[in-house]
């Protein structure tokens, strides 16, 4: 069965404000691929797909507010080739929600990595990840 898998399809997260979230993810390098809506008994659910090269983020805005808690997806990670340059680009785009003042360097974890977390407009945690 594994020969049929072609990679990660997308990661879905809830958002409080679709337009704000799309603008945020475009500002940090994502590209809006598609917008759609899906009817529900409570009204239309808004959907958007934002591409980041190797993966897609699906944004979902429910017509009835969803509790935005850590839940089953505490964060998502984006591989970067240069952590310092990627963090500088995010900051240059106006994002000032980094969760720590400095990156973490963890040489013994998963063969060695460095990372930096920041938050998106609905409180979602985003990890910039560079494998050493």
List where the protein language model places each region:
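N-terminal beta-strand motif that seeds the catalytic metal site of vicinal oxygen chelate
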Residues: 1-19, 73-76, 129-132
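Vicinal oxygen chelate
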Residues: 1-4, 35, 91-132
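Core segments of cupin and vicinal oxygen chelate
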Residues: 3-6, 13-56, 85
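Exposed loop/turn and edge beta-strand positions of beta-sandwich/beta-sheet ligand-binding modules
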Residues: 7, 44-46, 72, 112-113
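Short N-terminal helix-initiation segments at or just after the protein's N-terminus
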Residues: 15-25, 59-70, 91-95, 129
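Conserved short beta-strand elements that form part of the metal-binding/catalytic scaffold
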Residues: 33-70, 118-120, 125-130
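Long, charged/polar, surface-exposed segments that mediate recognition or autoinhibition
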Residues: 77, 86-91
